[in-house]
Amino acid sequence: MEAPQNVGIKRRLKRFFRRDGRALIFAMDHGFEHGPTDFEPVWEHVNPRVIIRKVVRAGIDGVMMLPGLARIAGDEVKPEVGLMIKLTSKTNLRPKPEQLLQSQLGFVDDAIKLGADAIAATVYWGSPQEDVMMRQFAEIVSYAHDLGYPVVQFAYPRGPYIDEKYGKKEDYRVVMYGARAAAESGADMIKTYWTGSKETFAKVVEAAAGVPVLLSGGAKTENPVDFLKVVWEVIEAGGAGAVVGRNIFQRENPEPMIKALIRVIHRNEDPEEAAKAEGLI
């Protein structure tokens, strides 16, 4: 008989993944990590209730936020939508050397009390502070798994050594390494960078050894079709979907983009056709 905690992990992962094994998750940690200026393109979205209400109505599979925001607006995440609470973060107000460290904001028990279906944490693989984040992640995984909760790793390789050796953090060899490290450190889901091509992202997926890999949405793409094409390539490469923030909340009306992403991720639709169907072009 399977251990009860493993059953719990599998059941809770299904709160995010549809039967096709894919997910579209809305990221809402930008106000802390980047600052409220991220919301200036559409200022009403600085109010978490406003934007969460919109994305839930549009059919999002899951929402990711920090513990404090979950206390403020977590009740806007309807029961049919997965809630992911991220326990580590940083601000852009830190001195540059400390930008490569994520600090812990809360504990697994806090996230569970707030109704989390999954726990998330970031590791900057290759950072001079990598050891601190590895230890944080190990403690979160150990405790959460004992209670039957899945853990998501935002596997973000970055640091001076990576810049020096590989030139950029999105080099597929670096992203692939980060995905493998995430899998081997106990992640049940991985969020990471786009590597620039379907072929290289497929290697990232393979390196993750069966752990679902989701795209980190990144900065807003002015042409929505360009972003939909990237997501389509992620799916073609074997990726399990996307975690998207700015490409949703920096749009006046985020609903068409969400619905177009759902078409690409869950229905395998051509990006241009999906964009046309939702009035994006």
From Swiss-Prot:
One of its GO terms (molecular function) is fructose-bisphosphate aldolase activity. The active site is at K191 (schiff-base intermediate with dihydroxyacetone-p). One of its GO terms (cellular component) is cytoplasm. Coiled coil: none annotated. InterPro entries: Aldolase_TIM, DeoC/FbaB/LacD_aldolase, DeoC/FbaB_aldolase, FBA_class_1, FbaB-like. It comes from the Archaea. Keywords: Cytoplasm, Glycolysis, Lyase, Schiff base. It is an enzyme of class 4 (lyase). It is found in: Cytoplasm. It catalyses: beta-D-fructose 1,6-bisphosphate = D-glyceraldehyde 3-phosphate + dihydroxyacetone phosphate. GO terms for biological process: glycolytic process. Activated by citrate. SUPFAM superfamilies: Aldolase (SSF51569). It holds the Pfam family DeoC. Its main location: cytoplasm. Belongs to the DeoC/FbaB aldolase family. This is Fructose-bisphosphate aldolase class 1. It comes from Pyrococcus furiosus (strain ATCC 43587 / DSM 3638 / JCM 8422 / Vc1). The gene is fba.
